[in-house]
Swiss-Prot record:
This is Transmembrane protein 144. GO terms for cellular component: membrane. The lineage of its organism: Eukaryota, Metazoa, Chordata, Craniata, Vertebrata. GO terms for molecular function: carbohydrate transmembrane transporter activity. SUPFAM superfamilies: Multidrug resistance efflux transporter EmrE. Belongs to the TMEM144 family. The gene is TMEM144. Keywords: Membrane, Transmembrane, Transmembrane helix.
């Protein structure tokens, strides 16, 4: 098997693993109260950093480039909005919105060479454009899929994984509820969608520093001359930026809460597991970037997690029912598959 064929195979396998894990990493948290998410995001980021430490040791501690930490800072900034997004518009819709803007930002910055990066060329640019477009179109189809979970069911075991946020107007206010729980339905939708858009743009920019270093490593006059072309060599710096930034945000939150942060101990282990799953998925994404290039991997990996989250809702939590919903899911899956194939063949 040729080197190019091996790279393609490795890249597509890594992409599949990343899609499955990104679509599943919040599932362990489904049954647990997470409050405003500030404590949870710190636990999740701590798990992410530990995975990076293991990977760094396996790779024999490659050179640490501080600039790669900036990408982690960008990601952590977007990540602090995840819990409010899920609470206001649901996990499925949240993933689909931030995934769409993630895909567009990451694909466009790589394809057109934004932020000082080299523009990436593909063998068949038209197919690449079509694939990127279909990846975004598929996301909007999921907006029409409705959950069948009754609104009067409050058990944590039946809370929809993909649901519309419903506020019980007659329920007594909980003194421990977060600011998100106090929003009206209209405010929740506006805030959730806005945060998802912002998070998506930030997520789509997270690889920019690493790609910038790799591109400038080929220039003798650059301070990054000779830097590694292996994306995994930047994992530790990238994830260190994530953990450092999340820690700063959490400490600032503790100060703002007058040293009385809302902690949810029952969410620690699920949050840690969620962080491990996310970290493994991101390592796979780094491998896909290396094997396929970001202009190919971004549309593929950002389109699939929404579909995986929907599958959890259908087969695990039984929250999506009805012929219309099933037909919409099949249509979305076909579009996702077509977009992924177009993007894949644009590389060949």
């Amino acid at each position: 098997m040729s080197s190019n064929a091996t790279d393609l195979t490795t890249g597509f396998i890594a992409s599949i693993v990343a899609i499955v894990l990104f679509g599943s990493n919040f599932v362990p948290l489904k049954k647990y109260e997470t409050g405003d998410g500030m404590f949870l995001q710190w636990v999740l980021c701590a798990a992410i950093w530990l995975v990076a430490l293991v990977v760094n040791l396996i790779l024999h501690c490659p050179k640490f480039w501080p600039f790669a930490m900036v990408g982690g800072c960008i990601w952590a900034t977007g990540n602090i909005a995840v819990v409010p997004i899920i609470k206001t518009i649901g996990l499925g819709l949240g993933i689909l919105i931030w995934g769409s803007f993630n895909a567009l930002t990451g694909w466009a910055s790589s394809r057109f060479g934004w932020f000082g990066m080299d523009a990436e060329e593909v063998a068949k640019p038209v197919l690449n454009y079509i694939g990127a477009g279909l990846s975004v179109v598929s996301a909007f189809i999921f907006l029409f899929i409705k959950s069948e979970i009754p609104n009067n069911t409050y058990s944590v075991d039946t809370t929809p994984l993909i649901s519309e946020h419903v506020i019980n107007k007659t329920q007594d206010p909980d003194p421990d509820c977060s600011w998100v729980d106090k929003l009206s339905t209209a405010q929740s939708h506006l805030v959730g969608c806005s945060l998802a858009v912002i998070s998506g743009i930030l997520y789509g920019s997270t690889f920019v520093p690493i790609i910038y270093i790799k591109d400038h490593s080929k220039r003798n006059d650059s301070i990054y001359a000779g830097a590694s072309q292996n994306d995994l060599d930047y994992i530790f710096a990238h994830f260190s930026g994530i953990f450092l930034t999340s820690t700063v945000y959490f400490l600032a939150y503790c100060v703002a809460m007058k040293n009385n942060p809302k902690l949810h101990p029952e969410a620690v282990l699920p949050g840690f597991l969620s962080g491990v799953l996310w970290a493994i998925a991101t390592c796979c994404w780094f491998i896909a970037n290396r094997s396929l290039s970001a202009v190919v991997s971004f549309p593929i990996i950002t389109a699939g997690p929404g579909f995986i989250a929907t599958m959890w809702g259908v087969f695990m939590f039984k929250e999506i029912q009805g012929r219309k919903n099933y037909l919409l899911m099949m249509l979305a899956f076909c579009i996702i598959l077509t977009g992924a194939l177009c993007t894949a063949f644009s590389k060949i």
